[in-house]
């Protein structure tokens, strides 16, 4: 039996699956694990080219999750597939995405924070297997993010830019 040790950076329990969780690593892979099978992982997901700093389960769809990485991108996943559903990256971003959070009110809205101080609010539409639209609002702020119910979000920012239909 081959064992592999990877440094974990983040973990998240899947919504609706209390015995399963996702763990991100410095090696750029995500492991789906079970509390019942502690000696091995259930699935491995590879799609990032650097450390994965955060994983967040979608609060509305139990099989959807989001990751952010040092490779300048956020990726949308379905834990039933081994490759990402989509990748989100600003055209002018050349820095690590260090934090992400889903909106508590909308199933297709999330925010990301980058190492250069920008906060990006992403909105996407996926209908009948086709990506219809992706929009990004970029705010330059400080690091860290937490979105509270009813969109309570305090930020200090210098400028804002909307990038429609990336």
Identify the residue ranges that each predicted region occupies:
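Structured C-terminal portions of repeat-based eukaryotic scaffold domains
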Residues: 86, 98, 104-158
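Loop/turn segments within WD40 beta-propeller blades
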Residues: 10-18, 37, 55-63, 100-107, ...
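Per-blade loop-tip surfaces of WD-repeat and WD-like beta-propellers in eukaryotic adaptors/scaffolds
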Residues: 1-8, 16-21, 25-50, 58-61, ...
């Amino acid at each position: 039996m081959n064992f592999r040790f990877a440094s974990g950076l983040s973990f998240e329990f899947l919504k609706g699956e209390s015995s399963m969780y996702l763990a991100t690593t410095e090696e750029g892979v995500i492991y789906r694990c079970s509390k019942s099978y502690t000696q091995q992982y259930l699935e491995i997901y590879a799609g990032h080219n650097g450390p994965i700093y955060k994983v967040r389960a979608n609060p509305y769809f139990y099989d959807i999750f989001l990751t952010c990485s040092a490779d300048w991108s956020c990726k949308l996943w379905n834990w039933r597939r081994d490759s990402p559903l989509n990748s989100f990256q600003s055209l002018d971003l050349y820095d690590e995405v260090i934090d992400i959070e889903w909106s508590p009110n909308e199933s297709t809205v999330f925010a990301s924070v980058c190492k250069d101080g920008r906060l990006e609010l992403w909105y996407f539409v996926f209908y009948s297997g086709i990506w219809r639209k992706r929009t990004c609002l970029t705010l330059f702020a400080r690091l860290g993010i937490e979105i509270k119910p009813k969109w309570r979000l305090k930020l200090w920012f210098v400028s804002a830019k909307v990038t429609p239909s990336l």
